[in-house]
Swiss-Prot record:
Protein name (database record): Putative 4-hydroxy-4-methyl-2-oxoglutarate aldolase
Keyword tags: Lyase, Metal-binding
Species assigned in the record: Paraburkholderia phymatum (strain DSM 17167 / CIP 108236 / LMG 21445 / STM815)
Subunit structure: Homotrimer.
Binding note for cofactor: Divalent metal cation.
């Protein structure tokens, strides 16, 4: 997928004004080999438990983007090297984590895009909690299942419809 988020914003100013194209706040760090990624959003709401993250990444990604609302927790990582490799193997385009990741050397070898608030060496709990396909409130925008995510070095866009 070839795009630049800055160009998408310029080309779709009317959608920015209307609210059908939104920009996440610039609070995320980037990992993984993909300099840009985009696709249809699959949403998860979890808190310090990555059981549902693993279960979702075990599915075929079909170039979709997994968006994980981890409540912004900075106390443990929701995605590490094993899950990054799993996402790559199963064809996910990218992972957005409103929380932490770990194993950054391994994540940076994965051929997908990963963005997260920060890194943390401690793994999450495995309690089996969380919700899938729900609307998420992330910094700067709501993200609904089936919306479109576009991310590059300039930022992350959320669109109600595909832009490229």
């Amino acid at each position: 997928m070839n795009f630049a988020t800055a160009d998408l914003c310029d080309a779709h100013e009317d959608q920015l004004t209307a609210g059908t194209l939104r920009v996440l706040d610039p609070v995320f760090s980037r990992f993984g080999r993909a300099s840009r990624f985009g696709g249809e959003a699959v949403t998860l709401k979890v808190f310090e438990d990555n059981t549902l993250v693993r279960a979702t990444l075990e599915e075929k990604g079909v170039a979709r983007v997994l968006v994980v609302d981890g409540g912004g927790s900075l106390r443990c990582a929701l995605v590490g090297g094993n899950l990054g490799k799993l996402g790559e193997k199963n064809g996910w385009a990218g992972i957005v984590v409103f929380g932490c990741v770990r194993d950054t050397l391994e994540l940076n070898e994965c051929n997908l895009g990963i963005i997260a608030l920060a890194t943390h060496p401690q793994r999450s709990q495995k309690r089996g909690g969380g919700e899938r396909d729900v609307s998420l409130r992330l910094p700067g925008s709501v993200v609904r299942p089936g919306e479109w995510i576009y991310a590059d070095s300039d930022g992350v866009l959320v669109s109600s419809a595909p832009l490229v």
